[in-house]
Amino acid sequence: MKKTAIALLAWFVSSASLAATPWQKITHPVPGAAQSVGSFANGCIIGADTLPVQSDNYQVMRTDQRRYFGHPDLVMFIQRLSHQAHQRGLGTVLIGDMGMPAGGRFNGGHASHQTGLDVDIFLQLPKTRWSQAQLLRPQALDLVSRDGKHVVPSRWSSDIASLIKLAAEDNDVTRIFVNPAIKQQLCLDAGSDRDWLRKVRPWFQHRAHMHVRLRCPADSLECEDQPLPPPGDGCGAELQSWFEPPKPGTTKPEKKTPPPLPPSCQALLDEHVL
């Protein structure tokens, strides 16, 4: 467990120790009507909103990193979700990385979060609000067992499941990434109400947070949506494949060279940075 905690901490702070990308040199949102441009892993945003860091329903972590920008739809989603959580007495929603002022590529920790439509949310709901020191150096709560096959019962709660379900039932949400063991527990607990599980997708890591992704806004004409998740609740063979040992000869994919930026994003960089 100690090794896992260290790995989680390293994941959350790694980006601070790497060289800045050009996008990190843009310190304020680019003026203009809100437009998400490109794909989630290769894009930018014009006219981003700033998530207010003061709220009765949520708290923003690591504000010193200035990653609390996004499309207005994302800001409204966070406010909507945290209000629903507050109404149900679930606790305070802890907001992690959204995007940078103009979106774009991070120097580490994320491949996506580039178009202002992604947010990481901790899977813990404190009843007592965190101090500023806790928010600046958050301690992730690893919900998954060391072998990765199930959640830790003492750390899992119906409130966490309710938070994920609330997010999945939001019309603007297209995907929620969680660890396969968390998805498995949601499948076990869901009962007959299962339509929302389609949006909850198993993915590597994501042991302590969920990564919520919104659909492209209708008026963001240069935004590239992902295909919809496959039909069904995703609780069958696809999910079980995540728990199978790697096939012999399987190797990690080579690191790919980033693709060219969408022209509008390159023009934005040319004007504001280069």
UniProtKB/Swiss-Prot annotation:
Q: Which residues form a coiled coil?
A: none
What keywords are assigned to this protein? Disulfide bond, Hydrolase, Metal-binding, Metalloprotease, Periplasm, Protease, Signal, Zinc
Question: Which region is the signal sequence?
Answer: 1-19
GO biological process terms, alphabetically, are:
peptidoglycan metabolic process; proteolysis
Quaternary arrangement and interactors, per the entry? Dimer.
Concerning its family, UniProt says: Belongs to the peptidase M74 family.
Q: NCBIfam families under this entry?
A: PRK09429.1
- The cysteines covalently paired via disulfide bonds are 44-265, 187-235, 216-223
Q: Name one GO molecular function term.
A: serine-type endopeptidase activity
Carries keyword Metal-binding? Answer: yes
Lineage top rank: taxon: Bacteria
User: Which species does the entry assign this protein to?
Assistant: Salmonella arizonae (strain ATCC BAA-731 / CDC346-86 / RSK2980)
Entries under InterPro entries matching the protein = Hedgehog_sig/DD-Pept_Zn-bd_sf (IPR009045), Peptidase_M74 (IPR005073)
Q: Does the keyword Zinc apply?
A: yes
Q: Say what the protein does.
A: Murein endopeptidase that cleaves the D-alanyl-meso-2,6-diamino-pimelyl amide bond that connects peptidoglycan strands. Likely plays a role in the removal of murein from the sacculus.
Annotated compartments: Periplasm
Q: Report the Gene3D superfamilies cross-referenced here.
A: 3.30.1380.10
Q: How is the cofactor bound?
A: Binds 2 Zn(2+) ions per subunit. Zn(2+) ion 1 is bound in the active site. Zn(2+) ion 2 is bound at the dimer interface by residues from both subunits.
Q: Where does Zn(2+) 1 bind?
A: 110, 113, 120, 211
Cofactor(s) recorded for this entry are: Zn(2+)
Q: What's the name of the protein? A: Penicillin-insensitive murein endopeptidase
Q: What are the transmembrane regions?
A: none
Annotated Zn(2+) 2 binding lies at: 147, 150
HAMAP family linked to this entry: MepA
Return the broad EC class: hydrolase
